[in-house]
Swiss-Prot record:
Organism: Drosophila melanogaster (Fruit fly)
Encoding gene (name): foxo
Location of this chain's protein in the cell: Cytoplasm; Nucleus
Pfam families the record matches: Forkhead
Protein name: Forkhead box protein O
Modified residues (Phosphoserine): 75, 190, 259, 262-263, 268
GO CC, one annotated term: cytosol
Function of the molecule: Transcription factor involved in the regulation of the insulin signaling pathway. Consistently activates both the downstream target Thor\d4EBP and the feedback control target InR. Involved in negative regulation of the cell cycle, modulating cell growth and proliferation. In response to cellular stresses, such as nutrient deprivation or increased levels of reactive oxygen species, foxo is activated and inhibits growth through the action of target genes such as Thor.
Region (Disordered): 39-90, 182-205, 217-269, 317-360
Amino acid sequence: MMDGYAQEWPRLTHTDNGLAMDQLGGDLPLDVGFEPQTRARSNTWPCPRPENFVEPTDELDSTKASNQQLAPGDSQQAIQNANAAKKNSSRRNAWGNLSYADLITHAIGSATDKRLTLSQIYEWMVQNVPYFKDKGDSNSSAGWKNSIRHNLSLHNRFMRVQNEGTGKSSWWMLNPEAKPGKSVRRRAASMETSRYEKRRGRAKKRVEALRQAGVVGLNDATPSPSSSVSEGLDHFPESPLHSGGGFQLSPDFRQRASSNASSCGRLSPIRAQDLEPDWGFPVDYQNTTMTQAHAQALEELTGTMADELTLCNQQQQGFSAASGLPSQPPPPPYQPPQHQQAQQQQQQQSPYALNGPASGYNTLQPQSQCLLHRSLNCSCMHNARDGLSPNSVTTTMSPAYPNSEPSSDSLNTYSNVVLDGPADTAALMVQQQQQQQQQQQLSASLEGQCLEVLNNEAQPIDEFNLENFPVGNLECNVEELLQQEMSYGGLLDINIPLATVNTNLVNSSSGPLSISNISNLSNISSNSGSSLSLNQLQAQLQQQQQQQQAQQQQQAQQQQQQHQQHQQQLLLNNNNNSSSSLELATQTATTNLNARVQYSQPSVVTSPPSWVH
């Protein structure tokens, strides 16, 4: 028995698929395709395949029969043809190269009526696409069914038709008017892309036409393609600086079109090299030329503007001093910055260092300027330039104080640093003192005039006398005066006594004239035909005022008398009430006393009658 177990167990020589197991144990040639392929981390599933890769033809084989509206053979052939056409496409899905929209298109096209409901599209997917065969249940089909609904409502190639029957889902059909090729998303169709493209095309055509016509910017600058037409036309025909071509720019200034920071074709104030801080003196450009006519025109223009602004500023200062308004506190003392102090020290050490040859109007610009100098090209030092030699250089320092606006003329001393001989310095000092004296005299005269005007305005109106006023033959028409007063409104009370108008109507016109008697007054004045002079009118007004005062006094006296009478009556009433109360009290007391006396008397015993026994 045991010997039988010592024998070797029988081995199977074939497997289920017909291959011998001995063959599997031999040396098999390893396929190179099974080795791990290296790829970048940016590549996601599925891995890109080579271009000459051919997929098997039996990828989509239909094993189940469709319903009566589906044709399995036609749909399978159409899907295979579509897959063969898209073998080298970059789009890779788990079921192949076809997208959801392509699958829905094949499903609807395979139906006999060329229309399917949503449930029939789901059924076609499960029956004809191997990837969805095991995903037909409700748990695993939620994702791809949602994608199908999304694609149906998104693409224009699908159209929804209402079903005739009640309670049935709608039909989905292919839109015959849809454009072939890649479908356009509906969200993009709402944008006005056509109009936008037309406008861009017109702008490009204009730019090209202007370039071909030879329109270039300043210094032969070509505008960039992204710049608009207006940016390439930086010409100033109205400006006197650019007309005639006499004004040339410095080569140190470059255009923004040649820089990396901007694509504009305008000039940039940034110098190309040797950048200096703002407080440094700018370089004297020798090639900056200007014609003599332009220079004279600029001098006249800036001179007249400076004179007008100076006069306005002086008038404002005079009025503020005359009106007695609180003036602003004086500005703090000027303290030059550190770099300015260093420059002044260098200038003091070498005062003649900048005495080089200068041409034209080459002067150093002010370091800190007022608001007028910043906004306008003001020539405040033109008068000083006329008295200077060509080699002299003048610098004006006007510090900017906080919380205060510096005036255009500054009305105070200029600190002139003259880097020339002592003779020019003395001449400038004398001229400066003369200007200060003239300004002080002008401001004093303006201040006196303003004070005089304010004093005249402060006088009361009662002191104004018409007799001292030279009126001449000035006459007043009462009718026109009344009509004018009535035109302002019917709430005016005009009091004019009629005694001076007509002596026969003294009794009827003794009282003041109210607004109801204006028509009678106009008739009387028109019938009389006499005109009142200003003196008579003044006398009438005085009489009216006196009458009004008398009436007011009478009314006040009457009110006072009535008040006194009322108080006396109240006192009398109080006295009467007190006396009546006393009488009533005494009467009640006497009656009570009599009653008590009667009750206190002893009773009298009377004898019985005679008939009583």
